[in-house]
Amino acid sequence: MNLPRDLKELNAFAFELNCGKYSSVPEFAIPKTNLKDKTSNELTKCIIKDFEVRGGIAYRINTMGIYDEKRGKWRKSGMRKGIPDIIGIIDGTFFGIEVKIGRDKQSADQRVIELEINEAGGIYYIAKNYKDYAEFMNAVFS
């Protein structure tokens, strides 16, 4: 199976997936994807779509607190600090993907989680752009 190596290929793979999902819809009516990786949100969407293209599953993890209107302040989410932005599974292998754009750096809590995931047999990766992430994933599955 060919795997995406860059955003252009990921968009093509994603379009093929959509064509398969909507086989009764004419091709011209199927929306084309325009995935980018300039912001954290865009890169996160790319990675989740990449997991789907590779036959896996992935979920975005929201560790942000919840605004309590009654109290007028934010409450902690209850999620453990340092959990990766994306968790996913491909062929039974657990992945924890931390998305970092620009000068964003890994926190001490995130380093602890990285060690725990690796010690448990999972794979942890810090994604800064889609191309480097795709090279890493293609190396894992080569």
Regions found by a protein language model. Give the residues of each.
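Catalytic phosphate/metal-binding cores of nucleic-acid and nucleotide-processing enzymes, i.e., regions
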Residues: 1-142
